[in-house]
Structures are given as C-alpha cells and as structure tokens.
Regions:
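Conformational coupling and interaction surfaces
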Residues: 1-4, 8-11, 15-132
Length: 132
C-alpha cells in the first residue's frame, strides 16, 4: 500500500471520487459458477480457479468488481450514494468517511441485496464473446 500516494489522491483529485467500501464487496461472493464453466483459455476463470484452490469454496469477495461495475455502468440502479469526504488519517493507511452534503466524494450504500448483486456480477464475468 502506498499511503502517501493515497493521501495525495484523496486530497487533490480534481473531480468527485465514488468509493466502494469494504462493506459493499464483503458480502458479494462471485466466481463459483464461473469456475464450473466449460470454457478454455479464460484468464478470469483460471485466476478464480486458483483462488478457489486456496480456500474460497463459496466464492471471492467482490470489492474490485463492484468498483468496476459502477465505473462502467454507473451506481444506479444498484446502489444509493452518500455525499461526504474521504480522508487518509494516518501513515498506516487507515481512513475515515465524514458524511457531508457539500463533500466532494460519494460513498456507495447498498440498495440491491448482496445475493442479487453476486448473480448480476457473476453473469457479466461469465459472458463469452460472440464469434463473428
């Protein structure tokens, strides 16, 4: 973790940042159906297969995937948001969120239940390109 860089980004980024916190991806488990697919040469499937071999029988928590989903599709209709300010508060990288209607950042708030989000995200992960 590069805490100084994180602090600089949080303080100086010129536009709002949408934060997908620990609590968002922590309960969204994905990958279980993906690794059972009958496809070859899938880097996503291969990576998840390795993770499952290391002890994630119910799927992987999906922090990064929720951030990607929102970056590509937007937070509606999946999440509500709360405006506020994100801060890196110490040299170990601990951070805080302060709700503030005039803050420059947004934080995702659960709207669609985690189980439904897992199905949605995993369906995107399982998508195969159409041959032309």
């Amino acid at each position: 973790c590069d805490t100084p860089a994180s602090r600089v980004v949080a303080e100086r980024w010129p536009t709002e940042i949408i934060f997908s916190g620990f609590e968002i991806g922590n309960m969204i488990f994905t990958g279980k159906k993906l690794v059972q697919m009958d496809v070859k040469d899938s880097p996503v499937k291969d990576a998840y297969s390795l993770c499952f071999a290391e002890g994630d029988p119910n799927g992987r928590m999906s922090w990064d995937l929720t951030a990607v989903l929102v970056a590509v599709k937007g937070y509606e209709p999946y999440y509500n948001v709360e405006r506020g300010t994100f801060r890196v508060v110490n040299d170990e990288g601990a951070n805080s969120w302060t709700p503030d209607g005039k803050g420059k950042d947004l934080r995702l708030i659960e709207k669609v239940p985690a189980v439904e989000m897992a199905v949605l995200i995993e369906n995107y992960m399982m998508h195969q390109p159409v041959s032309k």
